Amino acid sequence: MDPLQKRNPASPSKSSPMTAAETSQEGPAPSQPSYSEQPMMGLSNLSPGPGPSQAVPLPEGLLRQRYREEKTLEERRWERLEFLQRKKAFLRHVRRRHRDHMAPYAVGREARISPLGDRSQNRFRCECRYCQSHRPNLSGIPGESNRAPHPSSWETLVQGLSGLTLSLGTNQPGPLPEAALQPQETEEKRQRERQQESKIMFQRLLKQWLEEN
């Protein structure tokens, strides 16, 4: 038998409560950490993964919807700009037409047409005296003269009117004198000759123009 056990016979009884206390201290769950230790533990558990600055990728459906919305906004913007441009052009055209219709005696329209008209007139203009006084139209009918009536024909007309005799109950004028009839006949004859000359000249110019074109 061990001498230590002989000397201390109560040692087994004392050791048993100590072992029970040690087992009781080791057996239960560890106690909760203090308030100062909790932040340190939280920081130690953080992982060096991606930070919060990196955006989380959106799902494909949301990406398509956002793309459609941006596309529709851009298309609407372009459509609005195109509509405004068309509106400005239409208003400008309407104002121009209104200005042309409101111009007195169509001065504005004649001013635009006059260069082409002058060009065509210069092309078919004749240098003879009769064509300068009577400008022929394209239809072959001579136009009106720009000058005043010939004084001789006016005088003959006045003489013929002065020779008329007015009587009650008779509406037939008296005969014209022979001196007034001769200048009138010669004037009519000259006028017919001038018309014939202008017609021939116009036909010649028209034929020449058709051959050139």
Swiss-Prot record:
- Which residues lie within the region annotated Disordered? 1-62, 165-198
Q: Where is the composition biased (Basic and acidic residues)?
A: 186-197
Question: Where on the chain is N-acetylmethionine found, per UniProt?
Answer: M1
* Subcellular localization, as worded in the UniProt entry: Membrane
* Family matches, as Pfam families: PGC7_Stella
Q: Name one GO cellular component term.
A: membrane
State the source organism's domain of life.
Answer: Eukaryota
User: Where does the record place the modification Phosphoserine?
Assistant: S114
Q: What protein is this chain from?
A: Protein FAM156A/FAM156B
> Lineage from the top down?
Eukaryota, Metazoa, Chordata, Craniata, Vertebrata
The coding gene here is FAM156A
